[in-house]
Design a protein with these regions (language model features):
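Catalytic/RNA-binding core of pseudouridine synthases
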Residues: 1-244
């Protein structure tokens, strides 16, 4: 008989190549018992980093509170190349011979200020008539122009609490960004390049923090193999996290 699982939050360092839902499925196969489980914010399959998993009714009821917390990312973009997904897994749509300098990238970052209007990518989880945009894009049920019009209608103001360049090695640049809920880093990477006179595709994306939860606290998914592993790493529900 499997031991009971503790309830609370499990901080996972998601590896590349698996969906956020795939992480939930992996944990369900370990649990083998009926318990409410969910995650607080999707990461793209190619992305790595912080995925907060809620276990139990008390924790899952707080998912919506975690999802609106600010998030921190480290991302690397490649200038001069733009794909339909805005990441390296997509099909190249256009290229540019112009590669901005490090100083031009830095100037572009400053130009954003503390907020800007962002158009979500075509490949995103935002829904249109009940279907996520990424599903509509993959099905080919709508033209690219129609999808772009839909994405444009979902434009929103996003907050940029902190934005800095960490490294530059042409044509690649790496940034750290602390942003509001709903900010698409793939779009931000391309928008940075556009303001510097080029275009860019995201090659590396890692979420390093969600609100007060830091990646240093997280556990690699592959190191969790038993319920005991889960119980040893569960963070009890602490309402102080949500009252600050």
């Amino acid at each position: 008989m499997n031991p009971p699982v503790k309830t609370g939050f499990l901080l996972i360092n998601k590896p590349a190549g698996i969906t956020s839902y795939g992480c939930i499925g992996y944990l369900k196969r370990i649990l083998k018992q009926k318990i409410k489980i969910g995650h607080a914010g999707t990461l793209d399959p190619f992305a790595t980093g912080m995925l907060i998993v809620a276990l139990g009714r008390e924790a899952t009821r707080l998912i919506s509170h975690i999802m609106v917390m600010e998030k921190t990312y480290v991302a690397t973009g490649k200038c001069g190349e733009l794909t339909d997904t805005l990441d390296y897994t997509g099909t190249v749509l256009t290229t540019s011979d112009y590669i901005p300098s490090q100083e031009e990238i830095r100037t572009s970052l400053v130009s954003f200020g503390s907020s800007y209007e962002q158009i979500p990518p075509l490949y995103s989880a935002l829904k249109h008539q009940g279907s996520p945009l990424y599903a509509l894009a993959r099905q080919g049920a709508m033209s690219v122009e129609d999808l772009q019009e839909i994405a444009g209608s979902k434009q929103r103001i996003v907050q940029l609490y902190h934005l800095q360049i960490l490294s530059y090695e042409s044509p690649f640049f790496t940034i750290q960004a602390r942003v509001s809920h709903g900010t698409y880093i793939r779009t931000l990477i391309n928008d940075i390049a556009i303001r510097a006179g080029s275009c860019a595709t995201t090659y590396v994306l890692a979420r390093t923090a969600i609100g007060p939860f830091d990646l240093a606290q997280a556990t690699d998914l592959g190191s969790i193999n038993t319920i005991e592993d889960i119980n040893q790493r569960i963070l009890a529900v602490d309402l102080n996290f949500f009252n600050e």
